[in-house]
Each structure stands twice: as C-alpha cells, then as structure tokens.
C-alpha cells in the first residue's frame, strides 16, 4: 500500500485507491467469508477513524448492512455527536444512539463515595461501556463489531485495553494516523471531520496531540523508523529531537503488553496462541 519512492520522499505516502480496494476486500473476506456475517456495526465518535471505517464498511457490505452507533456521555462534545450524525446521513445508514451516562455514573457511584473518579479511570469505564453497547447491539442485529483504531494509537498504547481493541476485525490497524487522514480524504469523509483536532472525547477539551505533547506528523515518522529497527540516535539524525524520540520510544516499549492477548503460563505443547495455531494465524 506504500506509494512509490517513499524512501526518497514521504515514508508514509500511500496509494490511496489501492488501500481503499484492499480494505474493502479485507472487510468482505473477514466478515462474510470467514465469519458468516452480512452486517457490521461501527461505533461512531465523529472522528476521522470511525468515519473512515464506516465509509469502508458501506462499500464492502452495502449501506443497508451497516449500523452506526453513537454513544455520548454527559461531557461529550456536541460537535462530536453532530459530526457522527453527518456521517450517518451522508452514508444513509441505520443508526442507534445510546447515552452511556447512566451506566457509567451508576457504576462509579457504587465504587466511589462521591461518585467521582480520576479522569483516566472514568475514561476507561466510558470506553469499556461503549464496547458493552456495541457487542450487545451486535447480538441484537447479528452484525459484527468493526474496530476503528489506527496503527499510531496501537503502537503508543493510546487506547483502553479490552475496549477500543476488542472488535474482532480492524481495517485501520496497519495505517498510521496520517495515512488514515489521507485515505479518509480520498473516500470522501466530510472536510469538517478531517480538519478538526483528533480527540478521544473522554475529558472536555482533551486532544490526542495534547496528551502526546507531540504532533502526529512527527509521531508517525518516529514510529515508522523505530519499528523498522532504527536506533534512537539514528532517528534523531533524521531531524527529530532526542526528547521527541525518547518519548515515542518509551511509549512503544512500555505499552507492548497492550498489543498482546493475555499472557498464558505454558504447561503443555498445545498452549492456545503459542503452539495451538490454525494456518490463518501464521
């Protein structure tokens, strides 16, 4: 999917049309042929990742077979809710809106005396509650949940374990955030969504790049070089500061456990996920 001449130019350049066709084929194969589903359900945050996922799902399955789900919390941005609705209306897909406020606050009120929790804990509860909704609606509509996480977030561990990473198929998981933006523009995701700063929308005013302290343009390129085996000093020589490289490398290393299934203590030669693998797992 990488465009020609990327070593001499932009290492993150992609052939957008080839990527689109491959991901549409991936969704058809993984949902329909391998798992026997004809429908998919996508959680729509109003951001570029979930919007692109919905566009690809519609091309793969047909608009009548894609369900877009909005799951606001009481502190969620009204703009995010509106942008998710714009995607629903643009694609003409069925939609469901489930307010998760009562579920999240109801739980926290039982484990905290004042019903309050630090922002990270509350955000994790929100993310996991959204997965409860998606998987329940999956059972209701017989529609497979489709993941929306990009490669940058996965490599940085910028997601809630057993939440954002839970859907069984993820078309964007091998695309850096900057590549997601390029592909989203190519397939026609509304410009208002492409222009706004990325945010998990878990805390009012929160932005992803604000949490990182570094832009996606830099993060993606640093990650690109690190996962190809470059040493930090070599990445610095590419035009980044030692602090920027150390920050990204530190997150890449410290969050590796989040990109794996639970670690099993092996007791036999048939340990699931270690020795017992189907051909498709290799």
Residue ranges and their predicted role:
Residues 1-42, 52, 56-59, 64-70, ...:
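ATP/NTP-dependent adenylation/nucleotidyl-transfer catalytic domains that generate, transfer
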Residues 47:
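Conserved G/P- and acidic residue-centered "switch" motifs that form tight phosphate/ATP-binding loops
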């Amino acid at each position: 999917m990488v465009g020609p001449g990327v070593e001499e130019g932009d290492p993150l350049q992609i052939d957008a049309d080839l990527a689109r066709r491959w991901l549409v084929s991936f969704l058809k194969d993984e949902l329909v042929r391998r798992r026997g589903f004809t429908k998919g359900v996508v959680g729509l945050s109003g951001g570029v990742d979930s919007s692109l996922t919905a566009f690809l799902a519609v091309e793969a399955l047909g608009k009548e077979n894609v369900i877009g789900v909005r799951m606001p919390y009481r502190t969620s941005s009204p703009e995010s809710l509106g942008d998710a609705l714009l995607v629903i209306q643009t694609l003409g897909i069925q939609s469901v809106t489930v307010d998760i406020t009562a579920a999240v606050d109801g739980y926290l009120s039982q484990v905290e005396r004042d019903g309050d929790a630090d922002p990270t804990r509350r955000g994790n509860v929100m993310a996991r509650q959204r997965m409860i909704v998606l998987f329940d609606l999956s059972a209701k509509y017989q529609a497979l949940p489709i993941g929306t996480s990009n490669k940058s977030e996965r490599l940085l561990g910028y997601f809630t374990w057993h939440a954002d990473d839970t859907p069984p198929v993820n078309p964007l998981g091998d695309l850096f955030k900057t590549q997601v933006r390029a592909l989203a523009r190519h397939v026609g995701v509304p410009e208002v969504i492409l222009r706004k700063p990325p945010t998990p929308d878990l805390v009012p005013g929160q932005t992803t790049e604000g949490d990182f302290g570094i832009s996606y343009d830099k993060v993606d390129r640093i990650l690109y070089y690190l996962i190809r085996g470059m040493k930090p000093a070599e990445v610095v020589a590419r035009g980044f500061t030692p602090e920027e490289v150390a920050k990204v490398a530190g997150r890449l290393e410290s969050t590796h456990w989040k990109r794996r299934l639970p670690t099993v203590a092996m007791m036999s030669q048939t340990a699931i996920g270690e020795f017992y693998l189907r051909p498709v797992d290799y």
